[in-house]
Swiss-Prot record:
Recorded name of the encoding gene: rph
Signal sequence extent: none
Reactions that this protein is recorded to catalyse: tRNA(n+1) + phosphate = tRNA(n) + a ribonucleoside 5'-diphosphate
Protein family per UniProt: Belongs to the RNase PH family.
GO biological process: rRNA catabolic process; rRNA processing; tRNA processing
Chain's role: Phosphorolytic 3'-5' exoribonuclease that plays an important role in tRNA 3'-end maturation. Removes nucleotide residues following the 3'-CCA terminus of tRNAs; can also add nucleotides to the ends of RNA molecules by using nucleoside diphosphates as substrates, but this may not be physiologically important. Probably plays a role in initiation of 16S rRNA degradation (leading to ribosome degradation) during starvation.
Organism: Streptomyces coelicolor (strain ATCC BAA-471 / A3(2) / M145)
Keyword Kinase in annotation: no
Protein's name according to its UniProt entry: Ribonuclease PH
Keywords: Nucleotidyltransferase, RNA-binding, rRNA processing, Transferase, tRNA processing, tRNA-binding
């Protein structure tokens, strides 16, 4: 199958992870999956939610939003509408769950890290790009907190890496990392979140048209794990680079 942008079915879009994008946030990453661009800012605060106080454990949570003109037609800001949409809540919770899968709460101490993931430009896979970029922003925020002794230097709050990618079946062909034009044509689409050692955090799959078979599910999961392995390596390379603060 010939894809719109010339990629093979097993190929990611060009992925870039730019650290230190905002000077104010303790961790800041602009992540790009092709034309999808998401700004991920991590903010560290001392203390935890009331229900967590006295536990000696920290907390990590996330919020997701799209800029009004992130898509080809303008959408109203949810703050103007006066309510947060169900999709926004769902994706915010997904990002938070994904990051918490690789957090040692005890090692984090009673500190809170909030990840704000704002979609600047959308071309499919915004939630998976957000998870992938937010992990790097979280890692930088943890390093910042350790440098300021909010977290003990000998502790390791991050137990591993986490990334995410979309997969789907379009015109009978399993594809990795769908663009918007592919996503809307997909008979089956799926978002897969993996740890760096290949375990699954979350698998969200839907048959938009024909139900999918077990062997097709296995093929999609194989595609996704291979994609997440590539993304984990890109995260590692990004974090290995020197970051000037």
């Amino acid at each position: 199958m010939s894809r719109i942008d010339g990629r093979t079915p097993q190929q990611l879009r060009p992925v870039t992870i730019e650290r230190g994008w905002s000077k104010h946030a303790e961790g800041s990453v602009l992540v790009s999956f092709g034309d999808t661009k998401v700004l991920c800012n991590a903010s560290v605060t001392e203390g935890v939610p009331r229900w967590r106080k006295g536990s000696g454990e920290g907390w990590v949570t996330a919020e997701y939003a799209m800029l009004p003109r992130a898509t080809n037609t303008r959408g109203d800001r949810e703050s103007v509408k006066g309510r947060i949409g169900g999709r926004t809540h769902e994706i915010s919770r997904l990002i938070g769950r994904s990051l918490r899968a690789v957090i040692d709460y005890k090692a984090l101490g009673e500190n809170t890290v909030v990840l704000d993931c704002d979609v600047l430009q959308a071309d499919g896979g915004t939630r998976t790009a957000a998870i992938t970029g937010a992990y790097v922003a979280l890692a930088d925020a943890v390093a910042w907190a350790q440098g300021r002794k909010l977290i003990k230097a000998n502790r390791k709050p991050l137990t591993g890496t986490v990334s995410a990618v979309s997969v789907g079946i379009v015109d009978g062909t399993p594809l990795l990392d769908l663009r918007y034009e592919e996503d809307v044509r997909a008979d089956t689409d799926m978002n897969v979140v993996c740890t760096g050692d290949g375990r699954f955090v979350e698998v969200q799959g839907t048959a938009e048209a024909e139900p999918f078979a077990r062997d097709e599910l296995n093929t999609l999961l194989d595609l996704a794990t291979a994609g997440c392995t590539e993304l984990a390596e890109l995260q590692r390379k990004a974090l290995d680079a020197t970051l000037e603060r």
